[in-house]
Amino acid sequence: MAIVGVLVGVLGGAAIGGLAAARATRQCRKPSDRAGQAVLHRMNASHAGVTAWGLGHVEIGTDFTILDVGCGGGQTIDRLTSMAPNGKVFGIDYSEESVVVASETNKHWIASGRVQVQLGTVSQLPFPDATFDLVTAVETHYYWPNLPADVREVMRVLRPGGTFLIVAETYRGRRNDWMYRPTMQFVLKAAYLTPDQHRALLVDAGYEDVKVFVDESRGWICARGSRSG
């Protein structure tokens, strides 16, 4: 599981506890300084598999305008830009270090005018209503400050008929859940949801055609919903 791997990398093999746990939690939730850069590059590599799997559950038009929320090191932005060759991709993150690393990862796309990366928060997205055909959230919704309200804020910036896709590498109730739950709930203090809770999250926010997919062997999940229209 990549989250645990990132934690071990941050801690340098130390036991997760006390100040070490606090430092690891801080870097996973909001990377900063040199340690944060290392975490972001690690995430770019470790999240590649689950990202490819998750994006396989959504249709992406060649001219889509796309937002990646919590863009981290920017690898998802790069993948999305390749999948929408006539479109444009925006990335936001509330970590300044993430914006720097994601911009470096996508500097060739930025230079061509096809990618824009900026500082921002999911709770108050810096975009007009009905801007995007697709909004993605890869390995990030765990940490959103007010998950139900933030999911509704995502809907605001979706165009009618647009799609919101959550992709995550773990979920509550997965195989060997006992190995991951302490890290997710007590170390990272993350929103650790079951598949049914992912479904309810989107349905309660007003999304339509909600689907939840799991890869039980790897413990991966993605949840997809559309704005009416």
Identify the function of each model-found stretch:
Residues 86, 158-164:
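Short glycine-dipeptide loop
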Residues 67-124:
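Class I SAM-dependent methyltransferase SAM/SAH-binding core
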Residues 23, 30-44, 163-224:
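C-terminal alpha-helical "lid/dimerization" subdomain adjacent to the S-adenosyl-L-methionine
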Residues 2-35:
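N-terminal, positively charged/glycine-rich alpha-helical extensions of SAM-dependent methyltransferases
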Residues 45-64:
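Conserved alpha-helix/loop element of class I SAM-dependent methyltransferases that forms part
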